[in-house]
Amino acid sequence: MVTVRPRRVRVVCWASAVTLLVVFSLVATSLTGATGDGYGSFQRGDQLAMVGLGVFGALGFLLFTRPRVVADARGVRVRNVIGSYELPWEVIRGVRFDRGAPWASLELHDDDLLPMVALQAADKERAVEAVRALRRLHQAHLAAMADAATPR
């Protein structure tokens, strides 16, 4: 079984989410009193709204920590930022990680490419090892299919 999650992106996203929440909270605490020459003034609701915006922004950053790839002898489960796919090995032609590509992808028999955002070039050798492990699982499945098709 192979399970992969991006490492570098998760660290950056968590740090960004915490920073954004802290900044919005600090801005919210500084919003008090009159707005200058106008008639408005900042109230408790305005402060809570700023904190709420910070929470929503942080959750937006944390969406990018969602990608994951889990593969076993039966197939591959790919969870990207938005959307999830569960594919048996029978529909997969190969595992690609082209030079210069930001992430690996699955090449399907219907000529579609399914990106695997969890296998990012930013993770360098860790991503390459994960792609090799996926290719080994795919080759093992192909060998098992060839053995099953051979008459005895």
Predicted segment positions?
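Short hydrophobic/aromatic-rich motifs at helix boundaries and adjacent loops
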Residues: 29-30, 45-48, 74-77, 103-107
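A membrane-cytosol interface segment of integral membrane proteins
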Residues: 107-152
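Surface-exposed loop/turn and secondary-structure junction residues enriched for glycine/proline
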Residues: 7, 12, 34, 45, ...
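Single-pass alpha-helical transmembrane signal-anchor segments
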Residues: 16-26, 49-63
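N-terminal membrane-targeting/pre-transmembrane regions
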Residues: 1-42
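Acidic, Ser/Thr-rich low-complexity segments on the non-lumenal side of membrane proteins
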Residues: 70, 85-121
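Conserved beta-hairpin
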Residues: 53-88
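Hydrophobic alpha-helical transmembrane segments
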Residues: 40-52
